[in-house]
Amino acid sequence: MKNHLNNNEDNSTLIKKKVLFVIAHPDDECMFFTPTIQHYNFIGSEIFVACLSNGNAVGLGKIREKELIDSCIDMGINQENVFFDQTNNFQDGMNIIWDTDLVEKTILSFIKQTSADIVISFDECGISSHPNHISISNGLKQLMKNKSSSTTTTSTTSSSSSSSSLSNRTTNNLNKEIKAYKLETVNIIRKYIGIADIPLTKLLSYDENSTQTFISTQLFPPSSYSPMTKHKSQFVWFRYLFVFLSRYSFINTLIEIK
């Protein structure tokens, strides 16, 4: 089902964890994160999916919510572990940038709701350069930065300023052991050579202390195909091509957010 390319993987990742995937839209979970979800399913972790937008750009939000739930069930994720933001702060759109502080606050609320040990989402390029993906990356990065800062702050500093940001206040109660990872964006050639990107990944030099790589060895159809079929409103011809040609159907490289 999966292989590890990182032979020096932290032993803590082999222990059952509560893993939270933060995505922007329904179908992100299977288009991009299938190999990682497979890995954590394989080792018996409890998996949660938090979706900030229901993909309502053309009025299909409720349909797409149901599709995400069906896709997650297909991937072995409990329906009760699939969450949507209910604030309407995050509208789906290629020209919409989400507020970083709001994203951070929302991710934090999902972390507390799920008691997650690990949070996984997009990197700063968002795989497809989608601004909603990048907005999540910015919010998660800020959350982890503020968490790190809070560990070095003494209790006396809490009275130094009454105007401290929401970010710095809310991270004080965050589990200090939590880890966050971003899914690496690769160049367009590697993105669309599918399984052929595996040997290239092996050849590339990564920091094995902060990088994990997961591989799905299911080739035809790719393991992302079945859950993607649940997204009937989105499964048009070019997404068929993506599922079969994208390296993200077969391989995920995760980089720890320090």
Swiss-Prot record:
Keywords: Endoplasmic reticulum, GPI-anchor biosynthesis, Hydrolase, Membrane. GO terms for molecular function: N-acetylglucosaminylphosphatidylinositol deacetylase activity. Signal peptide: none annotated. Residues 147-170 are annotated as: Disordered. Its EC number is 3.5.1.89. GO terms for biological process: GPI anchor biosynthetic process. It catalyses: a 6-(N-acetyl-alpha-D-glucosaminyl)-1-(1,2-diacyl-sn-glycero-3-phospho)-1D-myo-inositol + H2O = a 6-(alpha-D-glucosaminyl)-1-(1,2-diacyl-sn-glycero-3-phospho)-1D-myo-inositol + acetate. Disulfide bonds: none annotated. Pathway: Glycolipid biosynthesis; glycosylphosphatidylinositol-anchor biosynthesis. Pfam families: PIG-L. It is an enzyme of class 3 (hydrolase). The keyword Endoplasmic reticulum applies. GO terms for cellular component: endoplasmic reticulum; endoplasmic reticulum membrane. Residues 148-170 have a biased composition (Low complexity). It is found in: Endoplasmic reticulum membrane. Belongs to the PIGL family. Involved in the second step of GPI biosynthesis. De-N-acetylation of N-acetylglucosaminyl-phosphatidylinositol. This is Probable N-acetylglucosaminyl-phosphatidylinositol de-N-acetylase. It comes from Dictyostelium discoideum.
